[in-house]
């Protein structure tokens, strides 16, 4: 038989049996194991827990208890909600049971009426099958409904679409409402109300028949969710769905952040658009210059108004040209370069001497080789100094060809031009600070002299092998056609930033030396500093030092660029920007380019004609004030700092002209009209120190400097005894040497001396702040609404260590050379002192210079020892047949004595006198 209906575990919903059920005791239904009856109390009603505290339930009972709790979660409801969930389809349960089991279930659910209706409700099973049991069940329940007015059993309906008993036979699976689709739930309207379980003996039920995968389906909800489907409150469901589907927009994030900001956003500086003619703008630009315009300034201003009056006005499209200013205003000729003329002329003369040209003398036969320029004179003296350098090894082998119409001339020979040692120079080193214009000037000179540049920059792989493969073939001999000699450009090899080498650039300098030695092309190297270059390349005749031009001339050039791009700014602002960036012309142009794109609107080309038929162009004037957005080093007093800091609260130049952006730093600027000046100054100092300390500690604390030296540098009266115990322990650990049993060897140079002014690259306020900030226990509140900033660290030594990483002594290549200079003495040279022992040298020299060679010697000795041992065992008989004396004689003949063999036998003995086993 099959029972389909709604189950409810709430027996109190039946008013007829409420009085009778209160006096009864609940009998838990066990599955395969019986449980002792538990009295039905208010706490453990229906599926109550055992009242015995401390008693451990068996595993089967615990699992049954969990299952009961789970069922209670879904089927227990209050009295008020019972009416609302009377027609709830989520409680639909379909069970397929036998006739005898159905009688037992009916006796459990209806113990009062079981004696009267047992014979009529559930007759004995017939042999006709399961359909007869189902029909009898439905008929008896319907007939019982008319006799019995109790709402124990409500009306039954068939759960299939055909509403016929025959279709119930096809339902062979038990369906839990969780695995049923929505359509099945809507068509199912059967109600079956459970009642208090009766009987004195717990009944044993079979294991539930779980649905198969074929009969399962996902719950699908329509656009609107029906509250009757879910047993839990609707409010929690809406919150859960909102958390999954809702996302804060970007505007909401910005608005919430802006609302929490203490500092109000400044109003955006409005730009004023003017209609002006190019001639008036050009005149205004000339009047703003401090000096008479230099050639490179005239080149920039020619974009506004051409210098030749006969030239028409095609300059308007060039003014509207888009792109980076560093490319837009890049020089195209030597006179357009913003640099000293001496440096430019030296490079240009050198490139002219390296250029391949035809011989100027007509007496030279046609078959002779093409020589260098006329600036190089051939040496007429037949006598040469033996120590002089032979240029024939470096001069290119050039094979000349006749015209294509001529026949092959066997007289075409390979000749080599002869140069003196002073005239030979096929490489040059150009130095200068970053952004001064080294590369742009080189490209301008090469473009003017018809040179093609082959550039190798740090972004490329520059190992020795790859460098020779890339440009090695380019530097070898080549064939030049006479008819195409003037039209063929020469080639210049440019090695950019040779002072910046990475780990993958192994063998770079060896490849450069080979390249210069065998190259037939001129080679130019650029660098920012010469401290890390080999000494062989630091020859004064081959170095061109780029120096910055005067600040007034640089200001004129920047102002001309701004006027050429139709941006009108006061000269004082340009001076402050140039003072901030120094000689970095590229950084100035990039910063102003970004600022102009943010602050100035895109100006369309609106041409208007006046009486003179001269077109109008639009220019903008910005309220760019001095000292805003850039650091002004001329600030000396606290009042100046307060005034400047209040103006610089928006940060850099880009943030200054984008006030609509959120100031993520949340700088607190107190209101001057509500507080006194001293209170404002105190809060400003704390805020400034706190912001500076965070950035400084984050940047500098990654290193591991020595604290003791820092104390000596910062305080002359400080000593090792004045330090705290923890600080002294850290100092001892910092001074722990890699040598076993030896303290740190003090550096004989200026490590313990106070730093020079040029070595201390710290701002004044940061230097003063480091001395006194971390001695304070905490910082005060810096905002008006009592918002506390994070407390500063109490560890003063922490910040002093960060300071030592900047001002600490760094190993200099000259110091290494001076220490190891005695190794370069000739054998015939007699010294008046004994060479120092390696243990007396600085620790860095021992680790970096001596240890690799010792390891190499040890490796080589062990390889030789293994080879001789293999040789002893391969002479037709095994090594065990050779006597010890014979083996010792063979090894002794190879140079191995007894002490050396003992030294090499132990793998940990080597270097144990110098290093620990962990550092070996």
UniProtKB/Swiss-Prot annotation:
It is found in: Nucleus; Chromosome, Telomere. GO terms for biological process: DNA recombination; nuclear DNA replication; telomere maintenance; UV-damage excision repair. Residues 1-65, 112-131, 357-411 are annotated as: Disordered. GO terms for molecular function: ATP binding; ATP hydrolysis activity; DNA binding; DNA clamp loader activity; DNA clamp unloader activity. Transmembrane segments: none annotated. Keywords: Cell cycle, Chromosome, DNA damage, DNA recombination, DNA repair, DNA replication, Nucleus, Telomere. It comes from the Eukaryota. Residues 17-29 have a biased composition (Basic and acidic residues). The keyword Nucleotide-binding does not apply. InterPro entries: ATPase_AAA_core, P-loop_NTPase. Residues 361-382 have a biased composition (Low complexity). Residues 388-407 have a biased composition (Acidic residues). Gene3D superfamilies: P-loop containing nucleotide triphosphate hydrolases (3.40.50.300). One of its GO terms (cellular component) is chromatin. Belongs to the ELG1 family. Heteropentamer of elg1, rfc2, rfc3, rfc4 and rfc5 forming the elg1-RFC complex. Involved in the negative control of telomere length and in telomeric silencing through a replication-mediated pathway. May have a role in Okazaki fragment maturation. Required for S-phase progression. An RFC-like complex (elg1-RFC) is formed where elg1 replaces rfc1 in the RFC complex. This complex appears to have a role in DNA replication, replication fork re-start, recombination and repair. This is Telomere length regulation protein elg1. It comes from Schizosaccharomyces pombe (strain 972 / ATCC 24843) (Fission yeast). The gene is elg1.
């Amino acid at each position: 038989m099959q029972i389909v209906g709604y189950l409810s575990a709430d027996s109190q919903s039946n008013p007829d049996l409420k009085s009778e059920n209160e006096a009864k005791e609940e009998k838990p239904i066990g599955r395969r194991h019986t449980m002792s009856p538990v009295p039905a109390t208010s706490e453990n009603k229906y599926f109550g827990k055992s009242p015995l505290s401390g008693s451990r339930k068996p595993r089967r009972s615990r699992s049954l208890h969990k299952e009961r709790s789970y069922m209670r979660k879904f089927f227990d409801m209050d009295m008020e909600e019972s009416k609302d969930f009377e027609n709830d389809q989520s409680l639909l349960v379909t069970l397929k049971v036998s006739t005898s089991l159905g009688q037992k279930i009916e006796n459990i659910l209806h113990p009062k009426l079981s004696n009267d209706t047992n014979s009529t409700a559930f007759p004995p099973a017939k042999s006709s099958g399961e359909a007869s049991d189902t029909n009898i069940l439905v008929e008896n329940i319907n007939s019982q409904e008319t006799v019995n007015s109790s709402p124990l059993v409500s009306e039954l309906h068939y759960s299939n679409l055909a509403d016929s008993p025959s279709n119930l036979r096809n339902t062979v699976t038990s369906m839990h409402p969780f695995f049923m689709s929505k359509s099945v739930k809507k068509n199912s309207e059967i109600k079956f109300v459970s009642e208090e379980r009766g009987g004195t003996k717990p009944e044993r039920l079979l294991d539930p028949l779980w649905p198969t995968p074929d009969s399962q389906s996902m719950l699908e909800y329509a656009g609107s969710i029906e509250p009757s489907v879910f047993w839990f409150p609707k409010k929690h469901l809406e919150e859960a769905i909102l958390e999954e589907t809702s996302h804060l927009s970007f505007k909401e994030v910005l608005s919430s952040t802006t609302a929490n900001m203490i500092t109000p956003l400044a109003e955006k500086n409005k730009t004023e658009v003017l209609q002006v003619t190019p001639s008036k703008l050009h005149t205004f630009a000339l009047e703003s210059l401090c000096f008479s315009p230099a050639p490179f300034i005239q080149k920039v201003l020619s974009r506004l108004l051409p210098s030749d009056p006969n030239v028409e006005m095609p300059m308007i499209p060039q003014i509207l040209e888009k792109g980076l200013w560093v490319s837009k205003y890049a020089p195209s000729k030597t006179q357009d370069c913003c640099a000293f003329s001496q440096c430019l002329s030296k490079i240009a003369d050198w490139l002219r001497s390296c250029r391949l040209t035809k011989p100027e003398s007509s007496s030279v036969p046609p078959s002779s080789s093409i020589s260098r320029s006329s600036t190089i004179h051939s040496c007429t003296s037949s006598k040469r100094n033996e120590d002089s350098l032979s240029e024939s090894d470096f001069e290119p082998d050039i094979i000349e060809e006749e015209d294509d119409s001529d026949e092959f001339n066997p007289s075409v020979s390979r000749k080599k031009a002869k140069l003196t040692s002073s005239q030979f120079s096929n490489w040059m080193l150009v130095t200068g600070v970053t952004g001064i214009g080294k590369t742009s000037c080189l490209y301008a000179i090469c473009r003017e002299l018809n040179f093609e540049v082959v550039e190798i920059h740090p972004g490329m792989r520059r190992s020795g092998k790859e460098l020779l493969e890339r440009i090695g073939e380019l530097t070898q001999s080549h064939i030049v056609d006479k008819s195409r000699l003037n039209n063929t450009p020469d080639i210049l090899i440019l090695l950019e930033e040779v002072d910046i080498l990475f780990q993958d650039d192994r063998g770079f300098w060896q490849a450069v030396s080979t390249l210069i030695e065998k190259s037939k092309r001129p080679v130019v190297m650029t660098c920012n500093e010469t401290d890390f270059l080999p000494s062989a390349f630091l020859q004064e005749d081959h170095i061109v030092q780029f120096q910055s031009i005067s600040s007034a001339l640089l200001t004129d050039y920047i102002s001309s660029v701004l006027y050429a791009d139709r941006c009108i700014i006061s000269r004082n602002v340009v001076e402050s920007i140039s003072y901030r960036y120094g000689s970095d012309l590229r950084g100035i142009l990039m910063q102003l380019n970004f600022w102009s794109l943010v602050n100035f609107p895109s100006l369309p080309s609106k041409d208007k004609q006046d009486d003179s038929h001269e077109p109008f162009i639009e220019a903008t004037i910005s309220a760019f004030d001095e000292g805003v957005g850039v650091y002004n080093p001329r600030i000396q007093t606290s009042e100046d700092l307060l005034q400047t800091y209040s103006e610089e609260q928006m940060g850099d130049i880009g943030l200054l002209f984008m006030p609509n952006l959120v100031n993520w730093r949340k700088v607190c600027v107190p209101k001057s009209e509500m507080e006194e000046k001293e209170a404002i100054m105190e809060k400003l100092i704390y805020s400034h120190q706190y912001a500076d300390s965070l950035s400084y500690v984050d940047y500098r604390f990654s290193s591991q400097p020595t604290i003791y030296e820092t104390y000596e540098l910062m305080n002359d009266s400080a000593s090792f005894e004045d330090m705290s115990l923890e600080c002294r322990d850290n100092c001892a650990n910092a001074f722990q040497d890699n040598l076993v049993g030896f303290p740190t060897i003090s550096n004989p140079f200026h490590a313990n001396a106070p730093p020079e002014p040029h070595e201390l690259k710290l701002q004044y306020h940061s230097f003063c702040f480091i001395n006194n900030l971390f001695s304070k226990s905490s910082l005060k509140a810096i905002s008006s609404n009592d918002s506390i900033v994070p407390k500063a660290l109490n560890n003063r030594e922490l910040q002093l260590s960060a300071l030592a990483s900047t001002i600490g002594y760094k190993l200099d290549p000259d110091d290494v050379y001076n220490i190891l200079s005695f190794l370069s003495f000739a054998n015939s040279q007699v010294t008046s002192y004994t060479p120092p022992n390696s243990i007396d040298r600085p620790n860095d020299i021992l680790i970096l210079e001596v240890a690799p060679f010792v390891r190499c010697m040890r490796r080589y000795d062990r390889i030789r020892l293994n080879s001789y041992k293999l040789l002893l065992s391969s002479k037709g008989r095994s090594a065990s047949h050779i006597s010890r004396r014979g083996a010792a004689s063979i090894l002794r003949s190879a140079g191995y004595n007894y002490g050396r063999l003992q030294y090499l036998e132990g793998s940990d003995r080597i270097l144990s006198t110098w290093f620990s086993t962990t550092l070996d």
